[in-house]
């Protein structure tokens, strides 16, 4: 196991508790830069940055969709390892959506912080072995997920959020 955890926690295989679902997209001829009836926003990694470029696709081609607040992971290249809170819409092939196998087992924000952690990010560096670095769901078979009791997950999330608030306040005063 990566490190010692409290006796009330459990080490789980990532894929036993979470699933990764890669995105999809139709051919570019179906892309529109203007929203219209029967279309949905197709989110790409660039849309979660400072200069989004909206693209819309017919709803019937939106095979992979997210709800607001879902967790998306960047899968390839220079964005590999970035973690996003999704907007409602479709997501493209450069991203993967995190699916919770049991919604009452893991708090979404706890999982979000897990994907930002060295435990995930370090393993991701190990498995991305090509020039166009990337991952697929089977790469997560040997990845571990530390699972505290549900209530403790919220305490961890609160502590992390409090730390970020403090860091932001300090940075603002520099």
Model-flagged regions — what are they?
Residues 2-25, 150-174:
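Non-catalytic DNA-recognition/assembly elements of restriction-modification systems
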Residues 10-17, 101-114, 142-148:
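Catalytic cores of nucleotide-enabled group-transfer and carboxylate-activating enzymes in metabolic
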Residues 15-31, 39-68:
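Sequence-specific dsDNA recognition surfaces
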Residues 27-35, 126-127, 172:
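Short coil/turn segments at secondary-structure boundaries
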Residues 31-40, 58-67, 82-94, 104, ...:
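Short, surface-exposed loop/turn microsegments at beta-strand edges and helix-strand junctions
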Residues 71-72:
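Generic structural signal for buried aliphatic residues
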Residues 76, 89-96, 129-147:
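A short glycine-rich beta-alpha junction/loop motif
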Residues 77-81:
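Short, charged beta-turn/beta-strand-edge "cap" motif at the junction between a beta-strand
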